[in-house]
Amino acid sequence: MLTERQLMILKEIIRLFTESGQPVGSKKLMSELPMHVSSATIRNDMADLENVGLIEKTHSSSGRVPSMKGYRYYLDHLIQPAVLNPMDVATVQQSFGRHYHKIDEIVSQSANILSNLTSYTAITLGPEMAAIRLTGFRLVPLGNHQVMAIIVTSAGTVDNQVFTIPNAISGDELEKAIRVVNDHLIGLPLTVVSQKLKIEVPALLMQYMGSPGGFLNIFDDVLKQASQERLYVGGQSNLLNFSELTDVSQLKSIYNIINQSDDLAKLLELSPGEANSQVQVRLGNEMTNDLLKNYSLMTVNYDVGEHGQGLIALLGPTSMPYSRMIGLLDLFREELAKKLIDYYADFDDSQS
């Protein structure tokens, strides 16, 4: 059982090490602790902390550094989010001050803002697709039996794909099919549109075209593109600043993790309906990829009411200043949520 003084010493070692990157010795602790404690007493307490595996000695110094076990204990029992100074608050608020034209623009830019604020790698995911509605659909003839299918959503995204129309489908049939979509699907959530596309829409289209399969495939393909969750990454190169790896192929593998959407989703362990109202921290030894053993991943959800939830993540060194980063993430998600809620309100007003 650790004493209150030992817990204070552990907390101080982590604070000093994450601020300076230098091992912490008893003399430094003696000058930093809020009460007077002799150097000998501090050394005894540090020995006890080392015996239970919460701190460890480095080869190059007589000081001590936190162990993975020490970081986990600190994160689970001791940490308190830092109170940010007014300059930090103003910087975050001003970063979201500009005008944005669509949801993806806000979410992608937020990753860049957060990476610039922290010098780490930031990852953002927009609000869940369940809340996004279909607001427009059209086909633009390009000639030679080709058309461009265009879908517009309430998130402000415009997705398009070029398709070759089967010879069996006439221009008149296409116009009627578009009318069916506009009459029955516009204004509905994309998840509902996808369901109706399989159940109700085929029967409606059969009234106007003999074989609606070609049109349904076109609409389904561009709908899937519009429904894809989009992960945005800011500060990719920051990840390499804290790597202890020297092998070029391993460094490339780390870089690829955050540039491949499947690998990134796996790293974030995205699960439908799972929400973190508090900042969660996974240390390197708690992640499945050994290349990230010297990194930590911080994640937290942000809430935009009826429009669902999104996610913010920060990937940095295990020795990052957790207290400050948690305080910053809490503020950042509040400001991002406000910006998105304002966007949705403006969008809804423009549609009414």
Curated annotation (Swiss-Prot):
Has the keyword Transcription been applied to this entry?
Answer: yes
BP term (GO), one: negative regulation of DNA-templated transcription
GO-annotated molecular function = DNA binding
Q: Which SUPFAM superfamilies match?
A: GAF domain-like (SSF55781), Winged helix' DNA-binding domain (SSF46785)
Role according to the record: Negative regulator of class I heat shock genes (grpE-dnaK-dnaJ and groELS operons). Prevents heat-shock induction of these operons.
| PANTHER family to which the protein is assigned, alphabetical | HEAT-INDUCIBLE TRANSCRIPTION REPRESSOR HRCA
Family designation = Belongs to the HrcA family.
Name of protein: Heat-inducible transcription repressor HrcA
Gene name for this UniProt entry = hrcA
